[in-house]
């Protein structure tokens, strides 16, 4: 534990700016009640009943009121952080909040009260076993959720839905490890612990459950991160019109002049609760215009980072040699959908054509101008992302969770291989189970380095 993890800390817990209510939060750390009671007396001029709302003045150093509001005192361990906590709920003006924060710092100087770092209140909740690490991350995810579906999924993670799944897997792995260790420790016994307890069947069940959890986690990660979709193609094929059609608003300038878009225009839209980050880019062509060339270079940078590229073509000309040149430069690992726009000029009905042979691309025929085929394109993007329509009970997950789950999956696959070789590989079987458990424990924070904790909590807002 870092030395600063026990310092008394204070911060404004509400968002910056003006609001009806603002909150200053104090967690007293090692100071405990000996620090809390004098600070309460200095700021409120009276004792506070634990866990009761008291309407009191907030006093300056001379006893004059800075504000009036609600004071709440939560003695340890029954608080958000597990420490003694004081919350002062006043009027949400930035000046009065700063005055109240500074008053707390001045009154608490004697016992070492300092400003909290980003995420430090939630970090303490984790260190004091009020939340596990997956739940702590869900606090930040709930605050940052960009769609209703993401917010509801983050709420389920905060409630412990994801953690319960992980704990159940860990318990099953521990049970299996006990059987293996018993067989290793008592080789002379006539009882075959593994056969008697159907160890292979138990392992198969664990692997099936892990696959289910990983599938749900992928859905949750998609809700959290969304999908980065880059619109690419030659100038004047309708990229800006398609952005406007997908967003349902006039976000980009649309003209018949080639090269109108010289820098990216980005917009996030929701499709079934999934954030789609749509990026309209400069048209790809040879040009002597220095500003346009910079925009084109940025387009290729966006394509390199994309989750999906929509390669727009004019349906009147189809795939031209210039389009072939562009397509040849697309990164091999990025999915590409060929979008033939302007079907309103050709009379071709809007449709989706899936590849008939390996290596072919999905083609979507649409009219961005009329909106024909836009819903088909949205559905195709969700299909590429792997979204399961109507999925219930999904919890939000992060990339580190997916990495840990995949690693655990690989260790269990190795364990299954060793189980088949039984006599020669029992030690390796046990080791793979241990490594799988270690990966699962890292998700909830039961086995996590201080460096990782520092990264996770540094991304929280101050006061949370």
UniProtKB/Swiss-Prot annotation:
Cofactor(s) this protein cannot do without: K(+)
Binding positions ((6S)-5-formyl-5,6,7,8-tetrahydrofolate): 25, 87, 130, 464
A Pfam family it matches: MMR_HSR1
Enzyme class: hydrolase
UniProt keyword tRNA-binding present: no
Entry binding sites for Mg(2+): 240, 261
InterPro entries in alphabetical order: G_TrmE, GTP-bd, GTP-bd_TrmE_N, GTPase_MnmE, MnmE_dom2, MnmE_helical, P-loop_NTPase, Small_GTP-bd
Binding site for K(+): 236, 255, 257, 260
Every TrmE-type G domain range: 226-386
Entry's localization field: Cytoplasm
Gene3D superfamilies tied to this protein: P-loop containing nucleotide triphosphate hydrolases (3.40.50.300), Probable tRNA modification gtpase trme, domain 1 (3.30.1360.120), tRNA modification GTPase MnmE domain 2 (1.20.120.430)
GO MF annotation list: GTP binding; GTPase activity; metal ion binding
SUPFAM superfamilies named in the record: P-loop containing nucleoside triphosphate hydrolases, TrmE connector domain
Ligand binding (GTP): 236-241, 255-261, 280-283
CDD domains: trmE, TrmE_N
Cellular compartments per GO CC: cytosol
GO biological process: tRNA methylation; tRNA wobble uridine modification
Top-level taxon in the UniProt lineage: Bacteria
Cofactor note: Binds 1 potassium ion per subunit.
Keywords (A to Z) from UniProt: Cytoplasm, GTP-binding, Hydrolase, Magnesium, Metal-binding, Nucleotide-binding, Potassium, tRNA processing
EC number assigned by the record: 3.6.-.-
Function as written in the Swiss-Prot or TrEMBL entry: Exhibits a very high intrinsic GTPase hydrolysis rate. Involved in the addition of a carboxymethylaminomethyl (cmnm) group at the wobble position (U34) of certain tRNAs, forming tRNA-cmnm(5)s(2)U34.
Subunit details: Homodimer. Heterotetramer of two MnmE and two MnmG subunits.
Family: Belongs to the TRAFAC class TrmE-Era-EngA-EngB-Septin-like GTPase superfamily. TrmE GTPase family.
Name of the molecule in the record: tRNA modification GTPase MnmE
Organism in which the protein naturally occurs: Burkholderia orbicola (strain MC0-3)
Gene: mnmE
